[in-house]
Amino acid sequence: MKTYTVAVLGATGAVGQEMIKVLQERNFPVGKLVPLASARSAGKTVKFRGEDVTIQEAADTAFKGVDIVLGAAENDIAKKFAPAIVASGAVFVDNSSAFRLNPEVPLIVPEVNPEDVKNHKGIISNPNCSTIITVTAVNALNTIAPIRTMTASTYQAVSGAGAGGPIELMNEVEALREGKTYEPKVFSHQIAFNLIPQIGGEQFEGYTSEEMKMQNEGRKIMHRPELKVSCTCVRVPVVRSHSISVSCHFDVPVTVEQAREVIAKAPGCKLVDDLKNKQYPMPLDTSDQDIVFVGRIRPDLTDDNGLCLWCCGDQVRKGAATNAIQIAELLVKE
C-alpha cells in the first residue's frame, strides 16, 4: 500500500494533537509524520504509533518531500506558510479561516460535498467547527426539498476557545466555591454558571465573526449561494462538544417522518430522537465521537413549511481534526 509523508502544522495545539491521534485511529497510510510547531517547541517529541517523533520548527524548508500538510495553526501562520507548502508540491488541508471564502479554495465537509476535492489548487479549507456540525446534520433535508432559509443558535463549549478555556472554567468554579474572585483571562466575562452571547468581534450589522462564518460557509459548502441564514453564537460552560438549535424552512411542507428517515440514513449522522424516553443529543454523549447526533425533530410552529432540530458534535474531532483527516482520505483516493 502506498504511504504518504504527512506534516502537522501546529502539532502541539489541541487540534494538532487530535489530528495525530485521529491519523492513528483511522489507520491513515502515513509513511512519515512531520510534526511542526514554533521554535520553542522544536526538539520536543510527540507519540505516533508508539514511537517518539521529534517536533521540527515550522519553516519554508520543512515542507520539502511532504505530500499532505494538515494545518492546525492560526490564520497568520497559515497565510505565512501556504505559498511554501504549495510550491513544495504538497496539498495544504487548512483548519484556519484564512482561505475558507476564497473562490479558488474548496471548502469541504466530506459527507456533504466530497466532489469538490478535485477542484483544489494546492489548498483545501476545513470549515468552522459549528458549520461542519450544522451542515452535516441538515444537508440530507435538501434531498426532500431545498432549504430556503435557516436560523441557528449555537451553544459552544469552552474548549472551542483553546486549551485555556476549560482551565478557566474550572478555575472559576473553584474560586466561586471558595468565595473568591477570579479575573477572566480567556473569555470577556465569567463563563462559570453563565452564558456569553458573543464569539468573535463584531463584523456585520451586529453579527459577530463567528456568526458570519456559519452563514457564509454553509452557503459555499452546500452550493447554495442564495440560501438565507441567520445565526446567534453563544459560549456555554460545557467543556467539550458544540450543540446547535436549527430551524429550516422550505417552499413545501416537509414532515417530521420524512426528516427522520433521511437523517437516519445520512452519512456522519446518528438519529437520537425519542422525547418520551428522554433520548436526544447531548454534548456529553458526543464528546470523543466522529459523528453528529441529531434529534428533537419537530414542526416549526411559526411556519407550515418549517422544521426544527437539535444537533451535537465534538468540535475538536468532527468539527476540526477528523474532518481534516477525512479530506486527506479523499485526496489519497483520487
Model regions and ranges:
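Charged docking surfaces used in two-component/phosphorelay signaling
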Residues: V69, V158-E334
